[in-house]
């Protein structure tokens, strides 16, 4: 008996270490704000968006002009005043894209930047969802541990009653042993719930950009809401505006524009050059300076090996992205419907357990104790009622946890915190 009590004290101390009552309480919205600002994955995605934006301007820029400085037709003796065609020359050459390949390349890079931006939004909502799940897991694991402690107190009361009746010769040893066994089993549950809370807190701390040991806050009750009855509004918004779909649409545009740009490069750009030659006097006679101008263009002799092959590659990538878009649309639709149905079922389960089952079972426990004190029933009936109440309280906490998980996953699908009573933090799009 003493070993059971000492193990209970150790478990209670561990629970108090996991949920420090003196710490500042952390609510879910504060946790999400910290995820938005300090999560390292989001910092990486913001840098990728910035890199994609920086690639837009170079994609459509003209090539830099080439300047030439030199000497033409110089005799081997190195003199500039012997031959009329000897001259010092300065020239400039510029490639001029006249058929729009650069413009198409710039638009393709812009579409790639849009895809990265939508990917950043999607990463934010996914991490918000993961943080909500971790927060709910940590909170409800703590609630389960507290429920175990409360049930342990009831078991201690049962053990005392059973032992007192047994010592007086009016009880059975079986009742004492069953109560002590249940008391020990509660310690096993308590250890499991405490481990679950620690793991969930570690996940939440990592998502918030903290070290695991740094999350010493107590947790406020997470928001509880009932999902809408009709999933049509959710599904309509998902199909229209979900960042995953916007990213894939932008990828389709990117590859289609890149294919057009590759084909447009077959159309010859102009290479324009101008040069000016300075001549020295010959035998005291001044020589006129000379200038030259040329226009050249590319002959697409090997276009099949380069530009057209690149265009075909981009066409294939565009088709692949279109297929990915269709698959993502179907996947999001089924996820939205499935999660909505699960959340509705969880919501009904929570209402039923909280409003009817648990309250009725508590009255049953009180009635069984009254009947036991009046001598109308034995202690085993009290034990059964108390154990049933503990099981229903655990089921209620698990149902609330499942509801929070499904709503968190719906948040990643809908990107709408207002459906769940949350004001989502503004998405940070750059580090500056």
Where are these regions (language model features)?
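Periplasmic alpha-helical coiled-coil/stalk elements that build and connect Gram-negative outer-membrane
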Residues: 3, 10, 26, 124-241, ...
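Sec-dependent N-terminal signal peptides
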Residues: 8-16
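N-terminal signal peptide c-region/cleavage motif recognized by signal peptidases
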Residues: 18-20
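Bacterial Sec-pathway N-terminal export signals of envelope proteins
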Residues: 22-71, 86, 95-98, 104, ...
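Short flexible linkers and secondary-structure junctions
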Residues: 24-137, 144-149, 155-159, 170-173, ...
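Small/polar-residue-enriched beta-strand and adjacent coil segments characteristic
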Residues: 27, 65-123, 244-258, 263-328, ...
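Amphipathic alpha-helical coiled-coil segments
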Residues: 44-56, 123, 127-148, 157-159, ...
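Short, charged, amphipathic alpha-helical segments
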Residues: 106-110, 173-181, 312, 379-387
């Amino acid at each position: 008996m003493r070993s059971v009590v000492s193990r209970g004290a150790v478990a209670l101390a561990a629970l108090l270490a996991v949920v420090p009552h003196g710490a500042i309480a952390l609510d879910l919205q504060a946790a999400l704000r910290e995820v938005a600002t300090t999560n390292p994955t989001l910092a990486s995605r913001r840098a990728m968006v910035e890199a994609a934006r920086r690639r837009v301007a170079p994609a459509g820029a003209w090539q830099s002009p080439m300047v030439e400085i030199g000497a033409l037709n110089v005799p081997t003796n190195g003199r500039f005043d012997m031959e009329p065609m000897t001259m010092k020359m300065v020239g400039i050459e510029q490639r001029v894209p006249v058929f729009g390949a650069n413009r198409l390349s710039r638009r393709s890079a812009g579409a790639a930047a849009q895809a990265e931006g939508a990917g950043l939004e999607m990463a934010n909502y996914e991490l918000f969802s993961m943080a909500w799940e971790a927060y709910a897991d940590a909170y409800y694991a703590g609630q389960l541990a507290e429920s175990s402690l409360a049930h342990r107190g009831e078991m201690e009361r049962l053990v005392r009653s059973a032992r007192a009746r047994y010592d007086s010769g009016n009880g059975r040893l079986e009742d004492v042993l069953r109560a002590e066994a249940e008391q020990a089993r509660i310690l096993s549950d308590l250890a499991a719930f405490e481990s679950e809370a620690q793991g969930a807190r570690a996940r939440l701390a990592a998502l918030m950009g903290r070290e695991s040991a740094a999350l010493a806050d107590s947790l406020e009750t997470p928001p509880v809401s009932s999902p809408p009855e009709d999933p049509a509004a959710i599904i309509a918004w998902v199909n229209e505006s979900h960042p995953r779909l916007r990213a894939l649409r932008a990828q389709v545009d990117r590859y289609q524009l890149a294919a057009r740009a590759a084909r447009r490069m077959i159309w010859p750009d102009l290479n324009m050059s101008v040069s000016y030659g300075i001549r020295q006097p010959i035998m005291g006679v001044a020589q006129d300076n000379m200038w030259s101008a040329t226009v050249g263009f590319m002959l697409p002799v090997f276009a099949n090996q380069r530009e057209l092959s690149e265009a075909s590659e981009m066409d294939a990538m565009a088709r692949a992205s279109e297929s990915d878009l269709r698959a993502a649309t179907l996947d999001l639709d089924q996820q939205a419907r499935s999660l909505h149905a699960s959340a509705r079922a969880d919501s009904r389960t929570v209402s039923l357990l909280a409003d009817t089952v648990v309250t009725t079972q508590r009255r049953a426990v009180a009635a069984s104790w009254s009947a036991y004190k009046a001598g109308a029933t034995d202690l085993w009936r009290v034990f059964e009622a108390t154990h049933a109440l503990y099981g229903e309280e655990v089921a209620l906490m698990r149902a609330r946890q499942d509801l929070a998980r499904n709503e968190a996953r719906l948040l990643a699908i809908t990107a709408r915190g207002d459906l769940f009573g949350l004001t989502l933090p503004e998405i940070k799009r750059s580090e500056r």
